[in-house]
Amino acid sequence: MRACILFASPRGKDSNTRALVDIFLRVWRAAGHEAEVFSLYDLAIAPCRACRGCQSDHTAPHCVIDDDMTPIFESVLQSDLIVFASPIYSWYCTAPLKAAMDRLVYALCKFYGDTRGPSLMEGKALCALTTCGYRVDRAADLFDEGLRRWCKHARLRWLGLHGARHMGYGTQFLTPEIEENAAEFAENILKSV
């Protein structure tokens, strides 16, 4: 199997969110699967223009914006699992991931043109990894609900959201409990894909 991971933390490889991604990757790759990680803060991803240029071709993304989304479109189309990984700062994902989500749902769901087409993501699985400063059920609940609806609309299978709370900058994030919970989530995703 193959996974496409959209990682969207401004703190990069030293972030708490990246720690969860690394645990997920360790479990995923140990099972013999491939993964491609895109660090969205290192890429140029423009917001969707809602121009509907992508709707003229029902077989490919065909986005008219020439930026770093092109390899992401291809990776998503080749993957069985899509993973969104973002810290939760204002009850939702960071801006680069939101821009990528908007571009994906327009370019890969051919629902918005003169004739209705398919979702090119139909049947793929999606899960999310998040970190936050509040309790996960109070910080990531809106993102969780948004992803449920996003999946229903785009005809993906929603496998769930895993979140971990960081108690503050002066405290250690990656505790044995957080690491164990993240690995367990990854194992469950393996069984569900």
Where are these regions (language model features)?
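N-terminal beta1-alpha1-beta2 submodule of the flavodoxin-like/Rossmannoid cofactor-binding fold
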Residues: M1-S86, S90-C109, G113, Y169-Q172, ...
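Short, glycine-/small-residue-rich phosphate/pyrophosphate-handling segment
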Residues: Y112-L159
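Beta-strand-loop-alpha "switch" segments that mediate conformational coupling across diverse proteins
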Residues: G160-R165
